[in-house]
Amino acid sequence: MDPTLTELLHANLEWIFVGGKGGVGKTTTSCALATLFATTPISDAASPGGTRPRRVLLISTDPAHNLSDAFNQRFGPHPTPVKGLEESLAAMEVDPKNFTHGALMSSLTGTKRDGSASSLPEEAAADAAQHTTTFARIGAVLKEAARTMPGIDEISVFAEILHYVRTLSYDLLIFDTAPTGHTLRLLALPQTLNSTFDKLMSLEGLAPMIEAASHLIGSNLGDLGGACGDTAGSCEQATAAPSPSSAAPGAGSAAAASPQSRWCITADEVRSTALHWRQTMEEVQARFSDPNRTSFVCVCIAEFLSVYETERLVQELMKYNIGCDSIVVNQLVLKPSSEPPCRMCSARQKIQAKYLEQIDLLYEDFHVVKMPLLSDEVRGVPALKKFARFLQEPYSPETHGYIDVQEPC
């Protein structure tokens, strides 16, 4: 097949994952690929000339982020325009600490999600303060535990994926993934969560049990004007906003904002939330397995461990029905014949030739892109553009010769 990623460029995909063994050039490849897509317009009949810039978001899912280093620009947990490509390319680095802090502290302390203090009746302030302090301490312990919880990196990344499923404001998302083990756990998450939800919801009495637990927690927060009663109906009344004609000014907001009302959960709400999550999981899983929307680009080097891990990755992707027909082989020692012989270069070329032959045999129906080893670091948009050129044009040492990706000083 064509030894380039040109077909990928014109496939009108929504998600592209770039992954492989650690240290093989995944970040450089994903950044170059994002730059290539961002500089390639897409068809749009409503735009002047029939085309417009493609809106690309590059997301690092690796706990050890390198996007900032690759672009010579600091990125955070929110999309930030890439300098020089502000109209078409943004990047972000998912931070599990931000995810666990926001998810836990908003629900386990006495503050609202917008950060303002809860408004309570004066007579209940002391009691509420005592219980709020207790729950704040519990929240701090849980937050610290969540930060070190196995799989939290994958869960935080998956939370970002869910967010962009619901609000897809970009034409393409490119994921610079963690090394193979992390990535496989991430890709398995929809299937795992679906199975877990099915097992949990099949347990008789689970929803009423959660409802009872929420009432117990609410009652332990103190008697704040009867926000939670003994039945689901009283709980629903506490969480519902009273009508203006039947409530005194400020009374309704106090009840609605009370700790009890935040902890009251009905069995129907449990089932509704579980159903909503399952539907979202199914949507993500459907996108993962749709070759017209999602593709995976494997990155490797021509060495035994990398080739072995790439084959394992390809087999796992097939198990999850995730499309993968592109492999980028980095760091190849490719020299023009006019160059003087080099003992070290010849030794490396001999090793690489053996594994390139295996790659060609294993992946004859893949787009195998062979990228040269460069003497300079690929950093910054200009260097990434030069590197990206050979993702859509096969590199030839005789034709292209020595490649300078960095501008001379």
From Swiss-Prot:
GO function terms (MF aspect): ATP binding; ATP hydrolysis activity; metal ion binding
Location relative to the cell: Cytoplasm; Endoplasmic reticulum
Presence of the UniProt keyword Glycoprotein in the record: no
Keywords from the named record: ATP-binding, Cytoplasm, Endoplasmic reticulum, Hydrolase, Metal-binding, Nucleotide-binding, Transport, Zinc
Spans traversing the lipid bilayer: none
Pfam families: ArsA_ATPase (PF02374)
SUPFAM superfamilies (UniProt xref): P-loop containing nucleoside triphosphate hydrolases
Recorded GO CC terms: GET complex
Residues engaged in binding Zn(2+): C342, C345
Active-site residues, Swiss-Prot/TrEMBL: D62
EC number from the UniProt entry: 3.6.-.-
Positions that bind ATP: K21, G22, G23, V24, G25, K26, T27, T28, E303, N330
A Gene Ontology biological process term: tail-anchored membrane protein insertion into ER membrane
UniProt function note: ATPase required for the post-translational delivery of tail-anchored (TA) proteins to the endoplasmic reticulum. Recognizes and selectively binds the transmembrane domain of TA proteins in the cytosol. This complex then targets to the endoplasmic reticulum by membrane-bound receptors, where the tail-anchored protein is released for insertion. This process is regulated by ATP binding and hydrolysis. ATP binding drives the homodimer towards the closed dimer state, facilitating recognition of newly synthesized TA membrane proteins. ATP hydrolysis is required for insertion.
Family as reported in the entry's similarity comment: Belongs to the arsA ATPase family.
Subunit-level organization: Homodimer.
Name listed for the protein in its UniProt record: ATPase ASNA1 homolog
Source organism of the structure: Leishmania infantum
